[in-house]
Amino acid sequence: MVRTINETFLKACRGERTEYVPAWYMRQAGRSQPEYRKIKEKYSLFEITHNPELCAYVTKLPVDQYNVDAAILYKDIMSPLPAIGVDVEIKSGIGPVIDSPIRSLQDVEKLGEINPEDDVPYILDTIRLLTTEMLDVPLIGFSGAPFTLASYMIEGGPSRNYHNTKAFMYAEPKAWFALMDKLADMVITYLKAQINAGVKAVQIFDSWVGAVNVADYRIFIKPAMERIFAEVRPMGVPMIMHGVGAAHLVNEWHDLPLDVVGLDWRLPIEEARARGVHRAVQGNMDPSFLLAPWPVIEEHVKGILDQGMKQPGYIFNLGHGVFPEVNPDTLKRLTTFIHEYSKEQLAK
């Protein structure tokens, strides 16, 4: 069955004019929602993501509760790694932990390839369920970027400084580029499978890429990113690039064949455009503001919207994920305000 969906988000991704500014929030599904916390009392993250009905329910919750203009598939960026031979455990209070970190070219050469229909069928089944039976807004698929995935694989878990990752990059360039190629292949195959299953846009999260300088990005990371965007682009869905702490890298994305640049709060939208970002923009509220009193939030959001709305092709989002402490009512009120204020301003 083909469902009719609200395409405001997709129009903004394509740089088209919209009646109002579309909004969705990174980590909109999950830890800040009481309904989700009740589910987590009974099921682990692994169990939720491996159960299409349960995962689809969690994915759809913020659409129903907050009236956001897009859903993003509820899963972890580490989800595809076991398929290529990486033993990952999500530990409460820590995050992803890998007991056997990458240390050599031999370790890289042991990595396999992903076959999504065989290795992650539950993800594809969740997408099909959502897009054929449940959603009236676009579903966003996603993947971690090679650098961020590699950082977990080399560090063995979250890191504050990525010393091991960068040391490996500098000291073992042959192994590094082999790892980038392996991960790029995985990301390409994984995103294509999500698109074939029904997602209407894809976002690549490079959560830790802000740790590298421009010259190193250009040499050690950008070639893999160029290949990912070039090979996924013919699939015909909007592609979003989001890096955290990556204001210094925005100019490196100008020649990547992507559709939307995701910004965090460190770079104002006006400044990004002044620096040559002439495609759609997504962002860029500091999620910390969501813990402030409503008048403070409203004034701050007005400022972001006033910058974003100066050109067609703007999507409101956070610069990083929703905190567990955020009141769901705040997100509902925020979406309503974004829609109403932007509609009023754009009608002038």
UniProtKB/Swiss-Prot annotation:
The record marks D76 as: Transition state stabilizer. GO terms for cellular component: cytosol. SUPFAM superfamilies: UROD/MetE-like (SSF51726). Keywords: Cytoplasm, Decarboxylase, Lyase, Porphyrin biosynthesis. Its EC number is 4.1.1.37. The keyword Lyase applies. Pfam families: URO-D. GO terms for biological process: protoporphyrinogen IX biosynthetic process. InterPro entries: UROD/MetE-like_sf, Uroporphyrinogen_deCO2ase_HemE, Uroporphyrinogen_deCOase. The keyword rRNA-binding does not apply. Pathway: Porphyrin-containing compound metabolism; protoporphyrin-IX biosynthesis; coproporphyrinogen-III from 5-aminolevulinate: step 4/4. It catalyses: uroporphyrinogen III + 4 H(+) = coproporphyrinogen III + 4 CO2. It comes from the Bacteria. Catalyzes the decarboxylation of four acetate groups of uroporphyrinogen-III to yield coproporphyrinogen-III. Homodimer. Belongs to the uroporphyrinogen decarboxylase family. This is Uroporphyrinogen decarboxylase. The lineage of its organism: Bacteria, Bacillati, Bacillota, Bacilli, Bacillales. The gene is hemE.
